[in-house]
UniProtKB/Swiss-Prot annotation:
This is Phosphoserine aminotransferase. Its EC number is 2.6.1.52. GO terms for molecular function: O-phospho-L-serine:2-oxoglutarate aminotransferase activity; pyridoxal phosphate binding. Disulfide bonds: none annotated. Pfam families: Aminotran_5 (PF00266). The modification N6-(pyridoxal phosphate)lysine is found at K195.
Amino acid sequence: MRAYNFCAGPAALPTAVLEKAQQELLDWQGKGLSIMEMSHRSKDYVAVAEKAEADLRKLMNIPENYQVLFLQGGASLQFSAIPMNLLGKNSKADYIHTGIWSEKALKEAQRYGDINVIEAGTSIDGKLAIKNQSEWNLSQDAAYVHYAENETIGGIQFADIPDVNVPLVSDLSSSILSAPLDVSKFGLIYAGAQKNIGPAGLTIVIVRDDLLDQSRSDIPSILKYSAQAKNGSMVNTPATYAWYLSGLVFEWLLEQGGVDAIHQVNLEKAKLLYGYIDSSDFYNNPIAVPNRSIMNVPFTLADEALEKLFLQEAEENHLLNLAGHRSVGGMRASIYNAVPLEGVQALVNFMDTFVQKHG
């Protein structure tokens, strides 16, 4: 049987998607070869790539004045690519700091421009939270404002889209496609694929057309959004198999009823898990309710000495990858789109049994 996988990334993929990929692995649609052996410039592959983009545009309702790029290097490469693409005419940017990933992004950006860091973390009744925008010290003349919509490690998420009068840039790696989003409020959205999109190796960048001519002159051509847009994300050979698999995930999402439908399931999963944690004296979540992530749920045990046993028994119950990030410890359940409600119910049942045995 397939286990329930709570890994933060590379993460669970829908079983139906893996089964389709398995069927097509050796002989893609009767062509006598695997899609991973196919030229990225062949008519067949270009059709697969174009359909994946069209389906993503449909799922996210992406306006026509935005380019959708299928790139490589992970979201971490975008930490450099974004300032190099957007700070050519104005070297100032605001970065909102709420956790480990937004910190990595701002530290990289500091190599390329004059970065104003907004410390937006706070606490409410001892729980971590994000300050109201009225308390941020935003610049008047920034080229853009950057934030990480959902901090994968900390499990802290913005309750609203920031309202700024310059282009808004967001790392959506762990929350893309989990809830409806008004793309028109953003100048640029980026996301590593290996959480809610597909396998590792692919990175999605959605960028508004008017931002394509803002790059620095010393930018490597492979990182230049305008060049990638002009060449259909094929300045060099793209991550063809990851692109194809992501396309299968987009098809699967459309079959589920799209982002609105999957969002309802995600809310149900989060309500079930947080509800159980809050009702327990043994488990604790460190995040204030308004800023709890619906995708990444960190929690601690009342007795830290039981952590190894918890993970061991969870694995015996086919519940995998529940250890928290190495930088923070504790536990973390990542409940992305591909993790079914039954998986979260199985986790809650196990957590309850564990307390009765060891709590």
